[in-house]
């Protein structure tokens, strides 16, 4: 039974003591909500994605090399130690570039997440940090060989959009009002605030998803446009010297063997370009200079008027692991390099030709490999089609007998006749051999690794594979299982010393 006075309520007082509460007791203060750190981090990541998305979209007008992720990734590739590159290529093969982009995205997400957390309490320094990230990317864009000062505009535009986006999203997550609740505030307003918070977070998430879609779409359009540009670009000129017909016996009749001629879409790609360069054949030129009597400069139309040679050549990457697939055989069409060097007049004392790509890559090609009887080409065609963009369109080097790192320059723009003592190439400055002759190699293609064997009726399993030794050819292949005897394999028909042989 209660006396006259205020009705009592049970509960815990502000000071932590339990007991009945009367109207005279002060109501607990309603503390303002603060955005959790994880939501602040999300704001930073989304703002960073907006920067990339806008820059990728703008790069459609400037070319893929102006995109910040491509430029920064290319700069990273240029400075990492060669041993790390070897390890990455050995582990991931042709997946090396996607792995690099994924790793870059993780690092970028961590950096922008920290910027977002900083923005929750110090918005101005956070905005400056995000702007600094954009400035860093712009500086790297300027260092890329094929870029001009205008190529910073996509990243600049992305930064100008991302910084206010960061501040707007921060405000949305923290709430729509800046007034501090008082002791007299009605608790019924809390659900409305929570609902607004949830709506804001959903909006932040949608902005992030949209940014990812735009960035991925722009990157896909950039890549697809490069491939489409080379389709039906021109009609391949007829060769003056056609490649010898490939005999039927060159392809070993064994299920699971790769085709003797590697299709363009399956041909391995290893290079330092994270995005296929934009090369306009209408403005492309090749400069031949250095230790020559007469400097030459040819445009693409003039090059196509030169006598063409067609030949079968197997190319191999020096990073190809045992049993690896970083080797391919194709039929190439192009201009013999020696004819242009003879026209330029190579001076005494020269022993190397430094080939340069539009993206700045260089290769040190021994002069004799371009002037002897081998079919070293300025290739414009591959397997009866215009050279694919990812394989060097409009012009690339094909030099039989040398690993790609010293010969297979794609998107070629320059040949400098020089000396090994005077110039060094991209990979030789990183400790690699100057000359890079291909070593004899063989691999087992059938059965593939981890395949469940299916012996025939006599309990035998047939092995098949490929061997190559460019400029020398394959005379025999011997196979040994465990500690058994060496057994000579049956070879497919020989095509040339510059192509692989199936067995």
Annotated model-derived regions:
Residues 1-38, 180-190:
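Actinobacteria-biased recognition of intrinsically disordered, low-complexity terminal regions
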Residues 209-212, 219:
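Extended acidic/polar, glycine-enriched regions
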Residues 186-208:
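N-terminal secretory signal peptides and thylakoid transit peptides that target proteins
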Residues 52-55, 68-180:
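Hydrophobic alpha-helical segments
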Residues 35, 39, 43, 47, ...:
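Alpha-helical transmembrane segments of integral membrane proteins
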Residues 31-39, 96, 142, 146-150, ...:
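Juxtamembrane/transmembrane-helix boundary motifs in multi-pass membrane proteins
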Residues 39-63:
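N-terminal signal-anchor transmembrane alpha helix
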Residues 57, 61, 66, 99, ...:
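Structured, non-membrane catalytic/scaffold regions adjacent to prosthetic-group chemistry
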């Amino acid at each position: 039974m209660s006396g006259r006075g205020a009705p009592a309520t049970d509960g815990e007082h502000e000071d932590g003591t339990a007991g009945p509460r009367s109207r005279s007791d002060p109501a607990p203060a309603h503390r303002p909500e603060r955005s959790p750190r994880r939501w602040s981090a999300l704001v930073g990541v989304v703002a960073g994605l907006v920067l990339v998305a806008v820059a990728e979209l703008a790069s459609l007008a400037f070319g893929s090399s102006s995109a910040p992720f491509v430029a920064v990734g290319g700069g990273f590739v240029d400075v990492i130690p060669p041993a790390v590159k070897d390890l990455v290529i050995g582990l991931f093969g042709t997946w090396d570039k996607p792995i690099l982009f994924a790793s870059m995205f993780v690092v970028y997400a961590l950096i922008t997440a920290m910027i977002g957390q900083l923005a929750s309490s110090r918005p101005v320094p956070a905005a400056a940090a995000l702007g600094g990230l954009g400035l860093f990317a712009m500086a790297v864009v300027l260092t890329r060989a094929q870029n001009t000062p205008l190529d910073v505009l996509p990243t600049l535009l992305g930064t100008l959009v991302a910084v206010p986006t960061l501040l707007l999203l921060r405000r949305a997550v923290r709430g729509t009002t800046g007034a501090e609740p008082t002791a007299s505030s009605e608790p019924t307003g809390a659900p409305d605030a929570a609902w607004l918070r949830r709506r804001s977070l959903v909006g932040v998430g949608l902005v992030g998803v949209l940014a990812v879609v735009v960035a991925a779409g722009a990157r896909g359009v950039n890549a697809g446009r490069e491939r489409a540009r080379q389709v039906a670009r021109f009609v391949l000129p007829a060769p003056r010297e056609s490649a010898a017909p490939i005999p039927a016996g060159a392809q070993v009749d064994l299920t699971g063997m790769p085709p003797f001629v590697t299709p363009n879409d399956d041909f391995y790609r290893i290079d330092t370009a994270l995005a296929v360069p934009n090369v306009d054949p209408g403005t492309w030129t090749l400069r031949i200079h250095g230790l020559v009597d007469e400097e030459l400069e040819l445009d693409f139309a003039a090059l196509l008027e030169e006598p063409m040679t067609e030949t079968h050549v197997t190319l191999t990457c020096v990073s190809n692991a045992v049993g690896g697939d970083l080797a391919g055989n194709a039929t190439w069409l192009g201009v013999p390099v020696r004819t242009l060097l003879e026209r330029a007049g190579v001076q005494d004392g020269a022993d190397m030709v430094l080939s340069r790509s539009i993206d700045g890559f260089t290769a040190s090609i021994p002069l004799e490999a371009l002037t002897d009887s081998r079919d070293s080409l300025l290739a414009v065609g591959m397997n009866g089609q215009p050279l694919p963009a990812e394989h060097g369109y409009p012009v690339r080097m094909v030099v039989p007998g040398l690993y790609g790192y010293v010969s297979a320059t794609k998107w070629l723009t320059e040949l400098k006749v020089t000396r090994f003592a005077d110039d060094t190439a991209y990979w030789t400055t990183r400790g690699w051999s100057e000359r890079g002759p291909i070593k004899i190699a063989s691999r087992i293609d059938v059965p593939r690794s981890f395949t469940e064997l299916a012996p025939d009726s006599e309990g035998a399993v047939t092995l098949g594979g490929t061997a190559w030794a460019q400029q020398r050819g394959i005379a025999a292949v011997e196979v040994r299982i465990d500690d058994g005897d060496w057994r000579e394999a049956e070879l497919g028909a020989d095509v040339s010393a510059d192509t692989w042989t199936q067995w």
